[in-house]
Amino acid sequence: MISLGMDSHDVLRAAVLHGGWLAWPVAALLLIGLWRCRQRKTRVALAGLCAATLLFLWARFAEPNLIVVRHTVLHGTGGTARIVLIADPHLGMFKGADFLRRVVARINPLQADAVLIAGDLTYEPQGQSLDTLFAPLAALKPPTYAVLGNHDEQKPGPEIDLALRAALRAQGVAVIEGRTTQVHGFELAGLGDRWAGKDDAGFLARIPSNQPLLVLAHNPDSADRLRPREYLLLLAGHTHGGQLRIPWLYRQVLPVHHGFDRGEQWYAGPRGRIRVYTTSGLGESGLPVRLFDPPVIDLLELRP
């Protein structure tokens, strides 16, 4: 129910979330009108409206429910490993345990050495059990590690970070913010969320400089916290790849300061260059739509 206190974004979100179904009869009426119409100008107008409506239906109901596996080989990492990187499932308002169960079913056959979750696991899950939402993670076969993102840390979002950490632990997921662990010959370190002011990387100084290092963070902008080293790869999410990947326009709304988008990029900072891989993520925030940017599981083949 839309209250008078809702702002324009809330009204738009409610309209897309709950009123989007009305686009189906609208599309049907437009197609019927296009078939019956004989006037050229009217047919062109109807065709344009029909195409726009069908594109909306795809972005609202089809693309957000796709799950694509993107396979990337990264050379020069200092070691060999098969890593699954996911981020931004945003369980809560738009997606739930059923979607996560499908994600797990796609990950398990990939025979990964580890699964890394780069934050934003939730999106306003008020009144929903976190244990129930994240129960499918218990079925993951590889060891699984996570950090939290801004929506998990009230930036913005409800105060759920402690409960979320407990729910993840209960499913066998290790939250590794501010600490390191070994993954198939790599040192894996986790950074807390940047918007929450928790991405201090000072603890990485104790890792030997010749040790291949993977850093898991939510926000790729955390690259500016790192010191260059021979073998270093930052793995992140947060950008959604634009979510609505309309050429040029999506770049104007990417929530980053250092120009990160998706895939492999390099951050050129005052200390030197940092290698970054950003996943497009699995879920949606703001509006329950994706366009030209389907939910993705990144399978990274790391090579020396």
List PLM regions with ranges.
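Active-site metal-binding loops of divalent metal-dependent hydrolases
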Residues: 87-91, 119-121, 150-152, 179-180, ...
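Beta-strand-turn-beta hairpins that frame and shape the catalytic cleft
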Residues: 74-84, 173, 180-190, 208-209, ...
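Structural motif
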Residues: 83-85, 116, 188-190, 214-218, ...
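Conserved acidic residues
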Residues: 113-115, 142, 211-214, 232
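Conserved beta-sheet core of the metallophosphoesterase superfamily
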Residues: 220-299
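Binuclear metal-dependent hydrolase catalytic cores centered on His/Asp/Glu-rich metal-binding motifs
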Residues: 156-173, 179, 184-217, 223-225, ...
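Membrane-embedded segments
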Residues: 78-174
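Non-catalytic terminal accessory segments
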Residues: 1-68
